[in-house]
Structure formats: structure tokens, C-alpha cells
Design a protein with these regions (language model features):
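12-transmembrane solute porter fold
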Residues: 9-25, 30-32, 45, 215, ...
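Alpha-helical transmembrane bundle and helix-membrane interface signal
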Residues: 129-131, 189-194, 214-231
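Interfacial helix-loop-helix linkers and transmembrane-helix boundary segments
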Residues: 70-71, 75-77, 133-135, 192-198, ...
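Short, intrinsically disordered terminal tails adjacent to the first/last structured region
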Residues: 1, 465-482
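C-terminal membrane-cytosol helix-exit motif in multi-pass small-molecule transporters
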Residues: 173-192, 207-219, 236-251, 447-457
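Transmembrane-helix bundle of Major Facilitator Superfamily
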Residues: 1-185, 318-320, 327, 333-341, ...
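Flexible cytoplasmic inter-helical loops of multi-pass small-molecule transporters
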Residues: 188-204, 251-256, 459-470
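Interfacial loop-to-helix junctions that mark the boundaries of transmembrane helices
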Residues: 46-50, 100-108, 164-171, 197-199, ...
Length: 482
């Protein structure tokens, strides 16, 4: 990619952030609409989980393929296709006649979404070559997540209360069209010098692993933990892992390059992403159902309740990016872990009569923690890798996020479903949700501990060694690797 002027780099950053906005906004808006979907389609808790997880599961399964494909055939080309598919999928979601087709159309959306965020991050990485400038750009990128969290519940609440839940998908149409036009005008084409070839076997094994794991968790409350269905999913997931790891180790150009994980910071960032986004996915799912179904708030009122959390995330994400650029990843990760853990403890101790101040503090603490977690994950994932493999490295980080989000909704939703009584929904919700909040607390504690472990001197030395090996391997011609 040629060196761009400062103004052109800012334009590229803005366009990439637009893609993140529509993808992030889509999920936050939909969470507010879940109770309305539940009423219109007479949906169970597992049905609501699938409207979220069908999307995140497909994205998680295809992100690495999208990243490597973009590095090989052109990042702008793949980005354009993703915008088109996502926009069309949004239009289809808005006319879905039943829950089953809504889930299918959400999967169409996800196919497009898988081509947006990791490819956009790869474009940003190759556009901003100075480490400090890149860290600030990633901080802005993380701030867009906060913006979507702030705007999503409010916009979603207004639309659901006034027009209906279908209108939430209309939001993506003008943003998607505008991003397509600006993409053609400002973003140059770029690709890796030696893009990796497709890995269909690895791709299939990843899909089987994530699908079996998520399906088994979501369906466990209804089918039973010892049912043939759930046990079959568990066996299938274990088998997929057992086949995937040795197969990828033998591949000269694997879908998931095991050498990435020789870097302790990269491995730590991957697990932190799973834990942090599992907490976020479960948090939004449980909070929305609690506010609307137990406290009987309207969609707009529930959106206003989430505003303190979203506002703090919006403010803290750019600050996290600046801290990463000036002081490294340890401080932001410690703040993130402490905020999420403290919030989880407060939520695990609450009941339906908790004072308003307690709940607001819990929302603010979670927003603070999540706001600080995104920038160090992204910066660690892409900064220690050769620029030629930026797409794949960013895709691994993004896959970890989406996997965490899917597992968070699946696991915390399954815990809720196993303890709740439909005939006494309000009376049993708080006790049924309490174990789920403790799981969220554990996710925050994991972020805290891993933040310490993955940012020390020994961890940094492992990152240097891993990057050197990757650079050395990157200079070996593909033909010589066979």
C-alpha cells in the first residue's frame, strides 16, 4: 500500500470505522428488541439466543478465511463484497416472517460481517505504520464500539417503541451504501506479498467445532446435559479439536497458524478476547431481559439504563488506546479486569428491589472495564506480527471476540433457562440469573490475571522470538515450503 497523506489516512480510518459501526450497532440494537421478538414469535430463551448466536457463530467461523482471502486477493475487494452482503442481509432481516427465517437471514448478514471488521483492521494496520499512530487509530476504532453501545440501545428503543423491531435493520442500509461509495473514492487496494492459499479442511473443522460447542450449550437446558444430542455435540467438538490441531501443524499455509501462539502476549490477548466478549455478550443478553421482563421498562427506558455503561465505554476506549501507545498493555488490562470483576460481583448480589444507585454503579463499572479491554487486545494481536500477515492476525483476534460473544450468550443464557420457570418468570428470574453473573465475574477475573501474565518481560521476549520466526518464514518462497 502506498504512503498516504494524513487526511487520506483519516478518511480510511473513518470508512473502516463505519463498517465496525453497522456491525456493532446491529447487535446492540437487536438486544433491546429481544422482548418484542419473544412476544411476536412466542420465542423461548433458546430461540432468543439463536437470533444473537447464529450471527456471531457464522462470523467467528468465517473471520479467518476472510482475513487470509483479503490478504491474498485484495483487501478493498473483499471489504466491498462484505458491505454488499451485509446490507442485503439486513434488508432480508427486516422482512422475516418468522423466527426461523430471521435466524437464517442473520446468518446471511454474518457472512458479510465476517468480511468487514478483520479486513478493516488489516487496512488500518497497513495504513498506519507508525506504532504510536496505529495505537491511537485502534483506540478510535475501539471508541466506535462505545459509540454503538451508546447509540444502539437508544436508537433501538426509539425504533422499537414507535415503529417496531423490524425497523432496527433499516439502520444498516444507508450506512452500508455510504460506506460503499466512500470505499471506492478513498481506500486504495492492498494485499500481502505472499497471500496464503485456502485451507478448506481447516475451515470445515473450525465450523464444526464452534457450531457443535454453541449448539450443545444452548440446547442443554431443554434437552438435558446427558441427552444424546448434547453428548453428541460434546464428542463432535472434542473430535474437531483433536483433528484440527495436528492437521494445522502439518500445513505449510494453515488457516490458523500455530506459530502465532508461540507469542505469550498474542495467546493471552486471544483468551482475554474470549473472556471479555463472553462477559459483554452475556451482560447485554441478561440485562435486556431483566430490565424489560422483570422491571417492565419499555425498550427506550431499557436503552436509557444502558447509557451510563455505553458512555463510559465510549470515553474510556480512546484513553485505553493512548495508554497502550504510551505505556503498553498492562495498565489498560488491569483496569479492564478490575472493572468487569467488580461489576459482576455487584450484579451477582442484586435482586429485583436493588436501589437504583447500585445498578447504575454496576453498569458504569462494566462499561469502564469493557472500554479498556478492546485496544490492548487488538494492538497486541497485530503489532507483533509481520505486516504481510496482518489480515490473518487480526482475524484470529476478531474470531476470539466473536467466539467469546457467542459462548457468553450461549452459556449465560443456558444457565438462565435452566433455572427459570416460565409460569413464574419474574419471581424466578433473579435467582436463576445469579449463577450467570458469577460466571461473568470469573471472566473479569481471568482478564485481570491474564493481563498481568501476558504483559511481563518474559512474555515480551516470547513475542520477539515469535515475530522473528514469522518474519523468517515469510521470506521463504511458497514453492520451497511444499
Amino acid at each position: 500500500m502506498p504512503e498516504l497523506s494524513h487526511r487520506r489516512r483519516m478518511a480510511v480510518l473513518a470508512i473502516c470505522c463505519m463498517s465496525l459501526l453497522i456491525v456493532s450497532l446491529d447487535n446492540t440494537v437487536l438486544n433491546v428488541a429481544l422482548p418484542d421478538l419473544q412476544k411476536e414469535f412466542d420465542a423461548s430463551v433458546s430461540g432468543l439466543q439463536w437470533t444473537i448466536d447464529a450471527y456471531t457463530l457464522v462470523i467467528a467461523s468465517l473471520l479467518m478465511l476472510s482475513g487470509s482471502t483479503a490478504d491474498r486477493v485484495g483487501r478493498r475487494r473483499v471489504f466491498r463484497i462484505g458491505l454488499i452482503v451485509f446490507t442485503v442481509g439486513s434488508a432480508l432481516c427486516s422482512i422475516a416472517p418468522n423466527l426461523g427465517l430471521l435466524v437464517v437471514f442473520r446468518m446471511v448478514q454474518a457472512v458479510g460481517g465476517s468480511m468487514l471488521n478483520p479486513v478493516a483492521m488489516s487496512i488500518i494496520t497497513n495504513t498506519f505504520t507508525d506504532p504510536r499512530e496505529r495505537a491511537r487509530a485502534i483506540g478510535v476504532w475501539g471508541g466506535v464500539v462505545g459509540l454503538s453501545m451508546a447509540a444502539g440501545p437508544l436508537i433501538g428503543g426509539v425504533l422499537v417503541d414507535t415503529v417496531g423491531w423490524r425497523s432496527i435493520f433499516w439502520l444498516n442500509l444507508p450506512i452500508g451504501v455510504a460506506a460503499l461509495i466512500l470505499l471506492s473514492l478513498f481506500v486504495p487496494e492492498s494485499r500481502a506479498p505472499h497471500g496464503r492459499r485456502p485451507d478448506p479442511v481447516g475451515q470445515i473443522l473450525v465450523i464444526v467445532l464452534l457450531a457443535a460447542l454453541t449448539f450443545g450449550i444452548i440446547e442443554a437446558p431443554d434437552a438435558g446435559l446427558t441427552s444424546p444430542l448434547v453428548l453428541g455435540c460434546a464428542v463432535l467438538a472434542v473430535l474437531a479439536v483433536a483433528l484440527l490441531v495436528p492437521y494445522e501443524l502439518r500445513r505449510p499455509e494453515p488457516l490458523i497458524d500455530p506459530r502465532f501462539f508461540r507469542s505469550l502476549p498474542f495467546s493471552g490477548a486471544t483468551v482475554i478476547a474470549v473472556c471479555g466478549f463472553a462477559a459483554l455478550g452475556g451482560f447485554l443478553f441478561l440485562s435486556t431481559l431483566y430490565l424489560q421482563n422483570v422491571r417492565h421498562y419499555s425498550a427506550l427506558h431499557a436503552g436509557l439504563w444502558m447509557l451510563p455503561m455505553a458512555a463510559v465505554t465510549f470515553v474510556s476506549a480512546p484513553l485505553s488506546g493512548r495508554l497502550v501507545g504510551s505505556r503498553g498493555t498492562r495498565v489498560p488490562l488491569l483496569i479492564a479486569g478490575l472493572g468487569m470483576t467488580a461489576s459482576g460481583v455487584l450484579f451477582a448480589a442484586f435482586d429485583g428491589q436493588t436501589h437504583t444507585v447500585t445498578l447504575v454503579v454496576a453498569f458504569v463499572l462494566f462499561g469502564l472495564g469493557f472500554g479498556f479491554v478492546n485496544a490492548p487486545i487488538t494492538n497486541t494481536a497485530v503489532s507483533g506480527m509481520p505486516r504481510a500477515q496482518a489480515g490473518v492476525a487480526a482475524a484470529v483476534a476478531s474470531t476470539s471476540r466473536q467466539t467469546g460473544s457467542a459462548l457468553g450468550v450461549a452459556l449465560l443464557g443456558a444457565i438462565l433457562a435452566s433455572g427459570i420457570t416460565p409460569q413464574r418468570y419474574e419471581a424466578t428470574f433473579t435467582d436463576a440469573a445469579r449463577p450467570a453473573w458469577w460466571v461473568l465475574t470469573g471472566c473479569g477475573a481471568a482478564v485481570l490475571v491474564l493481563g498481568l501474565v501476558s504483559s511481563g518481560r518474559r512474555a515480551k521476549e516470547s513475542a520477539v522470538r515469535a515475530a522473528a520466526r514469522l518474519e523468517e518464514a515469510g521470506h521463504v518462497p511458497v514453492a520451497a515450503k511444499r
